[in-house]
Amino acid sequence: MKMTRRDFLKWMVASGVALGMGKMDIAKAEEIINSATSTPVIWLQAAGCSGCTLSFLDMVENETYDKTVACYNAEDVLMNTIDLKYHSTLMASASSECMEVLNSEYKESGYILVVEGGIPTGESGNYCIVGERDGKPLTAMQALKDFAVNAKYIIAAGTCSAFRGVSGAGDNLTEVKAVDQILTEYDKKIINLPGCPVHPYILGGTIVKLLLGETLEMFTDTARTSGGDSTLMNTKRPKYFYPAVLHGSTTCPLLKFNKSTTLGTCRQCFERMGCRGHDANTIVSCYTKLWGVDWMNKKGCLGAGSMCIGCSNPSFPFTTKTNGVATSSSIYNFK
């Protein structure tokens, strides 16, 4: 399926411009794009709610914001098309036609693989079937392994694919795992972009930087996975897009205000009301990049009078376990 510059390309480049793509980057990108007819993108959906896809679509429709950052100029530079080979939600084809694409594209090489949703591994992966191959069910786990072989980059879009997230919360009966827990042999290809959902500018900006041939510096810290167990993992978050803990003097706009003790108050710090922004692993740039579109004022969670729920945190949604059994799960941390 082809998505022209008024679709995928415009969204992706808008993100790059908004995140600081300079003239040198644009000139380099022009050379890269002119040397190729398309950039293949495979978007695989596993156990999730399609929220990251919806986040992506919101950016595509954001015409006003594009003009605000003059991204239509960059759009003219990065012209032609990006070839979104497979996306089960957005494809015009369905059923067997969809599967023909899926079962042929993984044999090619050089594509960017975007993975949305956690990967169920229980019952040999049969809790999540993405289609059929040779008349047999094709699990998301097997599809992920197949596409990982020839992928140039593997982007875990959203907290479910990056850290298990909501899909792997609680007792995790379907034994959901994160992408990097399954693809251990392709560790250097993987880029985690957590968020529930992933921020569209972060996803788009990451793709732009990869196309420009830039090396993304990653965090080398470790953090607990969702479910509250003792498993430790490299978070693989690019520092450019995940620069600091949200609860900081330069990142949180509410930190300077009084501590609120009631919900529904404006311009108050919600640290005592359960805000997860102060957690050492709530590292994200969502407030500086902002959420939403112009008609909803692009305020994001904090600007809308809410608190941070820590959706980019590897422990999200913060399940508490007693003797290995999930006893509660709360996105808030009341003091």
Regions found by a protein language model. Give the residues of each.
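C-terminal segment of N-terminal export signals and the immediately downstream linker at the start
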Residues: 22-45
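Short catalytic helix/loop segments, enriched in acidic residues and glycine
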Residues: 59-78
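N-terminal export signals
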Residues: 7-29
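C-terminal and late-domain segments of enzyme folds
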Residues: 205-209, 213-335
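Glycine/threonine-rich flexible loop motifs
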Residues: 122-137, 165-171
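N-terminal secretory signal peptides
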Residues: 1-3, 31
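Catalytic-core regions built around general acid/base machinery
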Residues: 138-151
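Short N-terminal binding/cap micro-motifs at the start of the first secondary-structure element
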Residues: 49-55
